[in-house]
Swiss-Prot record:
Name the record gives this protein: Xanthine-guanine phosphoribosyltransferase
HAMAP family for the chain: XGPRT (MF_01903)
Annotated SUPFAM superfamilies: PRTase-like (SSF53271)
Predominant subcellular localization, coarse grouping: membrane
Length: 152
């Protein structure tokens, strides 16, 4: 990946609330299925904004920090997804999204960020990201001290 796109906590909340607005009215949803781990924080924000208390997870491993690898389903939520929002932070090449679509064909699949290769696989997203850009999520970063340029 050539470029980086840094996401702050504030940006993530703004984008997730924008997505929640599009998912109203909340009464149409039975619950939320968060794709672990990237979808966990966005799912919490959606659950709050939509007043949804039923939140489940599907646990799929496809990344090792910044490298994609083979998909492995560690845990799945029951059913075909009917009446559920499935949320992940990002749709990238579409590998995880394809597996999600197969598991939950009747779910409404949304992400905060979408790259061109994966866009056709989601029902809605908020932010377009170029394919060659790595997203640094706020839960993967920490604020650290940086010495002044003068060295004093």
């Amino acid at each position: 990946m050539n470029e980086k796109y840094v996401v702050t906590w504030d940006m993530l909340q703004i984008h997730a609330r924008k997505l929640a607005q599009r998912l109203l009215p909340a009464e149409q949803w039975k619950g939320i299925i968060a794709v672990s781990r990237g979808g966990l924080v966005p799912a919490g924000i959606l659950a709050r904004e939509l007043g949804i208390r039923y939140v489940d997870t599907v646990c799929i491993s496809s990344y090792d920090h910044d490298n994609q690898r083979d998909l492995k389903v560690l845990k799945r939520a029951e059913g075909d997804g009917e009446g559920f929002i499935v949320i992940d932070d990002l749709v990238d090449t579409g590998g995880t999204a394809t597996a999600i679509r197969e598991m939950y064909p009747k779910a409404h699949f949304v992400t905060i960020f979408a790259k061109p290769a994966g866009r056709p696989l989601v029902d809605d997203y908020v932010v377009d990201i170029p394919q060659n850009t790595w997203i640094e999520q706020p839960w993967d970063m920490a604020v650290t001290f940086v010495a002044p340029l003068s060295g004093k």
